[in-house]
């Protein structure tokens, strides 16, 4: 009963990605059964045409606070949220809504021509609108998760780093926050809300566990703990072989495991 998601910066952000243009990644996402992703600031590195016509074709991106610049209308190619119907072992299913959010710093962290025609609005306001439209109140979903490319840090008193996003844990109806962007390993609770971030470059997997109980046809979902699992460590010969095979296609030298 696992839902796998990403918090963005999928196709760019490293030297290797600049050479490959992210070509190896669609297959990886399919094998991992990644359901969706937030949009990271690096998603815009190669401009909107690449994001819309290439990256967004093989990955379901969501972002509630990326809108048209002229009138702040929704973008045709981008959904603010996505629902996953997750089957339960004992029968039935729960409906989980993921609301995407992107750091507003993207406006100053990428070239202006790469984000022409779009705007990044306040993430708290955007998330509140999605939840208030009836995701929970109208019984459309059983659970709401914010999937955000907005940094968090355990050393920050508020955990969430960006000033315009600090109130996200206080939005009524939100059950969890999955974050990225600051490259830190985070597992915390703010306002009794779990917040997790799994480091950078696939070094960790973030895992949030929830218990689902059914009573009179309604589901009660309770957070029962999480973990940040380190997956980068001692070399794995099978994985190293696959990586080297892929890198050989682009003229890279053999990967050495330290």
For each feature predicted by the language model, list its residue ranges:
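Acidic, metal/ion-coordinating pockets
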Residues: 1-234
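Hard-cation-handling environments
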Residues: 219, 230-258
């Amino acid at each position: 009963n696992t839902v796998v998601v990403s918090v963005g910066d999928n196709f760019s952000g490293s030297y290797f990605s600049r050479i490959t243009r992210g070509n190896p990644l669609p297959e990886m996402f399919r094998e991992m059964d990644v359901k969706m992703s937030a949009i990271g600031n690096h998603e815009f590195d190669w401009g909107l045409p690449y994001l819309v016509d290439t990256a967004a074709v093989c990955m379901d991106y969501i972002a509630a606070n990326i809108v048209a610049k002229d009138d702040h209308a929704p973008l045709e190619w981008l959904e603010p949220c996505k629902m996953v119907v997750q089957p339960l072992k004992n029968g039935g299913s729960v409906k989980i809504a993921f609301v995407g959010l992107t750091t507003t710093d993207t406006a100053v962290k990428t070239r202006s021509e790469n984000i022409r025609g779009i705007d990044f609005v306040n993430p708290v306001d955007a998330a509140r609108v999605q939840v208030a439209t009836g995701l929970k109140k109208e019984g459309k979903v059983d659970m709401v998760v914010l999937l955000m490319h907005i940094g968090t840090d355990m050393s920050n008193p508020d955990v969430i780093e960006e000033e315009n996003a600090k109130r996200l844990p206080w939005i009524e109806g939100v059950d969890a926050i999955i974050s990225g962007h600051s490259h830190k390993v985070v597992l915390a609770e703010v306002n009794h809300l779990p917040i997790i971030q799994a480091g950078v470059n696939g070094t960790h997997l973030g895992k949030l566990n929830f218990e689902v109980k059914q009573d009179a046809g309604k589901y009660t979902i309770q957070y029962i703990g999480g973990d940040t699992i380190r997956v980068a460590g001692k070399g794995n010969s099978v994985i190293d072989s696959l990586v080297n095979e892929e890198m050989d296609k682009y003229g890279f030298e053999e990967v050495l495991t330290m």
